Amino acid sequence: RGELRGGVVGTQMANLGLEKALNDLGIPFARSKVGDRYVVELLHELGWQLGGENSGHILSLSHTTTGDGIIAGLQVLRTMVERGQNLATCCEGMTLMPQVLINIRYQGQHDPLASDAVRQAMAQAEAVFAGQGRILLRKSGTEPLLRVMAEGENETQVREMAEQIAASIRAVTA
């Protein structure tokens, strides 16, 4: 409807299917670190209005500077009414890619991300995906967890790669 200024900001955890759907519509997509604060920072830096996180926080700077579920829900309902479509029809252009998230608790004595075995498992997964998927390995900002996220077109392959990386982390943190 011409109201979107610029593009959309998501986090590192945003599904590749969202990025592809927006790109297919000619809408730029940028990724920030995880957290509303980082989404807002990137929105301001780029001069854009709309962003969000997988947690469901949707930020529409033209309405508010924080995530507001009521405002986001009302905007979706308005679009549905204007188009005369149900939610499923409105979302037909987006197909989420298979995504696996494994959380691994660890003690803070050493950094598992610095391990050669973990780096080797990451490199192997990236080679298997060959540009058709991605791996994200990050520490939680709120608890002693490592998050292994894998996504790509082949669900079995995505799960296998995530589990291999998780196993390498468990081996060095045991």
Model regions and ranges:
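Phosphate-binding and adjacent anionic-ligand microenvironments
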Residues: G2-A174
